[in-house]
Amino acid sequence: MKGLLHFLLAKIILLALASSFVYCYEPSPLQDYCVATNETNGVYVNGKFCKDPKCVTANDFYTSGLNVPGNTSTGPGVKITVVDVKRMPGLNTLGVDIARIDFAPGGLYPPHTHPRGSEIFLVMKGKLFVGFVSSNEYNYTLFTKVLYPGDVFVFPKGLIQFHANIGKTNAVVIAATGSQNPGRIIIGNAVFGSKPLIDPKVLAKAFALDFNKVKYFQAVFS
């Protein structure tokens, strides 16, 4: 009987810990809203100080500009216009953000991950080739799709994904993530452009590359 009680107690503790781990990455709000402010005399929640609720206005939950095309003339031909907590303070603690992504013809959003949020795409214009790769649990399976206006595609949190404009015109996507700060890790930049750089010998062995090739990639990405 004593052993059974110990077993049940251990099980309850493990379940409680598991529940806390599930919610620790994006805490549930304990109030209706916590509008972010730069003032430091308020309550500190989710990395931001909360504005006095009596001073909150509708403008704290509003922004505009996603109708304006982004400049895609530099880099890989992609411009991301993000509405995050910096641009809309009322997003703080709400667990979402939204962005407009503009692609020039041939534009590419390189392989990357969002470590803190899943992402959903709504194609507004153009023709996009998108995909993501599963983890080792599912043998690094590649899932791809060609998307057209009105199509929706979702990318699971933390998995490597990419988006390419394969049409002859500009493409526009409205993207939302399940985090006010989903983070972004561009794979090439992280591996070959870290600060400080990863030892080239490590990367040469990991990717079965010539040492000089690794040095070249590091020069490109750093």
UniProtKB/Swiss-Prot annotation:
Keywords: Apoplast, Disulfide bond, Glycoprotein, Manganese, Metal-binding, Secreted, Signal. InterPro entries: Cupin_1 (IPR006045), Germin (IPR001929), Germin_Mn-BS (IPR019780), RmlC-like_jellyroll (IPR014710), RmlC_Cupin_sf (IPR011051). PROSITE patterns: GERMIN (PS00725). Residues 1-24 form the signal peptide. The keyword Methyltransferase does not apply. Its main location: secreted. It holds the Pfam family Cupin_1. SUPFAM superfamilies: RmlC-like cupins. It comes from the Eukaryota. Residues 64-215 form the Cupin type-1 domain. It is found in: Secreted, Extracellular space, Apoplast. One of its GO terms (cellular component) is apoplast. Disulfide bonds join 34-50. The keyword Coiled coil does not apply. Glycans are attached at residues 38, 71, 139. Oligomer (believed to be a pentamer but probably hexamer). This is Germin-like protein subfamily 1 member 5.
